[in-house]
Amino acid sequence: MSKEKIAIAYSGGLDTSIMIKWLKDKYDAEIVAVTGNLGQQKEIENLESKAIATGASAFQFVDLRKEFVEEYIWKALKAGALYEDVYPLATALGRPLLAKAIVDAALAEGCTMLAHGCTGKGNDQVRFEVTFASLAPHLKVLAPLREWEFTSREAEIAYALEHNIPVSATKKSPYSIDENIWGISIECGVLEDPMVAPPEDAYQITTSPENAPDRPTVVDIEFVQGVPVSLDGKTMSGLELIMKLNETGAANGVGRLDMIENRVVGIKSREIYEAPAATILHFAHRELERLTLEKTVFQYKKNISQDYANIIYNGLWFSPMRHALDAFIEETQKPVTGLVRVKLYKGSLSLLGRTSPNSLYNEELATYTEADTFNHKAAAGFIHLYGLGLKTFSEVNPAR
């Protein structure tokens, strides 16, 4: 009788490395380790040999970067999705795609179970398991970190040494870090005190604003229907554009975010993020929308932006609601074509200009010069009708 197979999300870190051995023994199963490339800079070249040496029977490496940018990041950007008006959702966006890759591998390999290495206290367990349930409800889900016997990192290292599991964890960084091309999340250590300023060693890619260049950097970003397509006049792929903006923004100290956020599981947490490209692109995209969207659409879309951000953050990417909102968002983005010029300087963003063939700004109507074509006399009748309801109310209720 053949053994059952378990597909696991594998990063090569301490937790997922010992998870292979632990699951293999507990369930007498074969382990299929799956790693997705979402643009993280972390070493990924030797993961296959490490997974096999740890006890996996198979390994799948999936380059998800193009799909991540085109089907996840750009959707979130067009939606204006910033969780609680700050977080550009880098980790939250990556989880459903990674979970989808694990499901695909599990189905291809004939697995009967899925496993992840998330703790029982965070958001990611929700994102993985809700996605698993959405895409493969017939597969059993395992969460070893919620049930295994290890109560400390030291205990995990001891287990690894006992079973000759190759891990490099000998000195722990004080921070927990997750990274993909859209941003980096940093937590734990001294960051758990919300009154402690983040030490410089917490930041992974951004230059301290104080040490950033004394001369500003100016970038021109061109959008077509809400999607960035060129940088400084050079057409490039979404992946290349994000990588370049990450580099340029980081060098200028742009993209450092510090927030107290409300987790899915009901607690508040202090999070530090680095997201240079995301910060710049959200800023530029919003300014282009101000120029091209009709007033009521622009104002109403802000509500949709928050709803969309909540859907992503709460792990509901594959929900009918997200698909329904996409239809509205795609309609709003049809006129969002044009160029935005942004100045980057010592951690700050400044808008220098914007232009669009679909601009709703009419200089002849807006000007106060002799070129003015606005009918000033029409304002009297408009104001009379606009305030008529309140005038009538006050006449009936004089005491108010």
Swiss-Prot record:
Residues engaged in binding L-citrulline: Y87, N123, R127, S176, S185, E261, Y273
Keyword Cytoplasm: yes
Pathway in which the depicted protein is active: Amino-acid biosynthesis; L-arginine biosynthesis; L-arginine from L-ornithine and carbamoyl phosphate: step 2/3
Enzyme Commission code: 6.3.4.5
Entry's localization field: Cytoplasm
Molecular functions (GO terms): argininosuccinate synthase activity; ATP binding
This protein's record includes keyword Lyase: no
PROSITE patterns found in the cross-reference section: ARGININOSUCCIN_SYN_1, ARGININOSUCCIN_SYN_2
Reaction equations catalysed: L-citrulline + L-aspartate + ATP = 2-(N(omega)-L-arginino)succinate + AMP + diphosphate + H(+)
Gene Ontology biological-process annotations: argininosuccinate metabolic process; L-arginine biosynthetic process; urea cycle
GO cellular component, one term: cytoplasm
Short name of any one Pfam family annotated for the protein: Arginosuc_syn_C
Source organism superkingdom: Bacteria
Residues noted as binding ATP in the record, renumbered to the chain: A9, Y10, S11, G12, G13, L14, D15, T16, S17, G117
Keyword annotations: Amino-acid biosynthesis, Arginine biosynthesis, ATP-binding, Cytoplasm, Ligase, Nucleotide-binding
UniProt: L-aspartate binding residues: T119, N123, D124
Major localization listed first in the record, in broad terms: cytoplasm
HAMAP family membership: Arg_succ_synth_type1
Protein family per UniProt: Belongs to the argininosuccinate synthase family. Type 1 subfamily.
Subunit structure: Homotetramer.
Protein name per Swiss-Prot or TrEMBL: Argininosuccinate synthase
Record organism: Chlorobium phaeobacteroides (strain DSM 266 / SMG 266 / 2430)
Protein's gene: argG
